[in-house]
Regions:
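Carbohydrate-binding surfaces of carbohydrate-active enzymes
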Residues: 1-174
């Protein structure tokens, strides 16, 4: 209805002949698709070699343009409090000892959350690259991943970060 109303308005406003409406594209039947194999990210990284660094590395530092990076940090002492990732680009799911504890997002301006990491605990931060900024003043801020220090209660978490690149540019080996 809106299409025809706008078209009729245009026909009154232009001096040339408006072309005929194109024929409708036929709808086709798509057969049922069965997805019978799955693999979770934690299983995928179990067999991968991590890149290690004192601080989290960006996607660009890891020579990765798309997909996800899993940032992992082992703690030999318990730590709890407000975790802040001021330089998150773009979206992260946070796990402690394999259990999802929250989400952070540049889009919704959520860059902090409470964490409680027990003795010998593991913090996993799965960061998704949601695409590149390609216009405007923020075009120069196009680094992806964790781009600034991770802090808990204001203390920078350094040493022994492991990064697992998951570009999702090919099917994972699920054998």
């Amino acid at each position: 209805e809106k299409y025809n109303a706008i078209r009729a308005l245009m026909m009154k406003s232009v001096a040339y002949k408006v072309p005929a409406v194109p024929a409708r594209i036929p709808v086709i039947a798509i057969p049922k698709i069965s997805l019978n194999k799955t693999v979770d990210v934690m299983t995928m990284v179990a067999g991968m070699k991590a890149v290690e660094n004192d601080t989290p590395m960006t996607f660009e530092d890891l020579n990765q343009g798309t997909g996800y990076v899993l940032y992992r940090r082992h703690f030999n002492q318990p730590i709890s409090g407000m975790m802040r990732i001021k330089g998150l680009a773009d979206y992260a799911v946070v796990y402690v000892n394999g259990t999802k504890v929250g989400e952070l997002s540049r889009v919704t301006d959520v860059d902090s959350m409470e964490v409680n990491i027990p003795f010998n605990g593991v913090l996993d931060i799965l960061v998704e690259n949601m695409g590149r900024i390609n216009y405007g003043a923020r075009i120069v801020e196009s680094f992806k991943g964790i781009t600034k220090p991770v802090t808990i209660e204001g203390n920078e978490i350094t040493g022994n970060w492991q990064m697992y690149s998951l570009p999702m540019d090919r099917m994972p080996d699920m054998t």
